[in-house]
Amino acid sequence: MALGFRGDVADYYHRYRRGYPPEVFDALVEVFALTPDDVAVDLGCGTGQVTVPLADRVRAVVGVDPEPDMLARGRRAAAERGAVNVSWVVGTDADVPALRAALGDGAVGVVTIGQALHWMRHDDLFREVSSLVRPGGGVAVLTNGTPLWLQDSDWSRALRESLEQWLGTPAGGTCGTDEESQERYRRSLAGAGFQVAVHGVDYTDTLDVESVVGGVLSALPVDRLPSDRLAFTERIGRALEPHGPFTEHVHVTVLTGQR
């Protein structure tokens, strides 16, 4: 199931989607007692924001994504970092049974899902994953802050207004970061037999117009990208200019389900 995150969108995603703080990976190691003998699976891996740094902590990581272009950028990121223990597989959450057949039941220390669970059938996924992970292992659902256009700041409100004028529709789409979605995921994990916990990491980031625009474009399907990128950037820049600096207070949620 390709989602339209190919071509230029994959480039924007690779360049402008920030990675996760080291404390996130420290938490995964602690919660799931990960060792250099473990295998991890990163579902909906995109261009490797979780996959590549996680490779430093385990024996091998399998990055799974429906878009070959995203995987190609992830492979490039792994090569640049010297991570030779990552495999990149075209697939979706529906392919977890095939992963179980290939890797074996109880073969995986952790299955990570970084800001991608809203694309998946989470109830079915958690039930399938429960047999894939070893005792003490489990699932980690990660969010890396609220979407740029939905934050509680003057610059974010100006961005949202400009996007809504351009799109002609409300700029919604919480990407599973809202409390209602998180509560739904917690219940689903518990229903699949996992021991549920929530961890948080906070940090502050300062953006410029280029990174704001790049972040927005990384979230659009390729057929919705503006035809005139320069004009789009100038439009967003004019909307944001009175509201600088563009400071973002990021709350990373690490929702874990331990078997």
Q: What kind of region is each of these model predictions?
A:
Residues 120-129:
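A short, conserved alpha-helix within the catalytic core of class I
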Residues 130-203:
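Conserved catalytic/acceptor-binding region of the Class I
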Residues 115:
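Short catalytic micro-motifs in class I SAM-dependent methyltransferases
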Residues 1-35:
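Conserved class I S-adenosyl-L-methionine
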Residues 98-110:
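A short acidic, Gly/Pro-enriched loop at the edge of an enzyme's catalytic core
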Residues 39, 47-96:
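Class I SAM-dependent methyltransferase SAM/SAH-binding core
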Residues 183-259:
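Conserved Class I S-adenosyl-L-methionine
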Residues 43:
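Conserved beta-strand/loop positions that form the S-adenosyl-L-methionine
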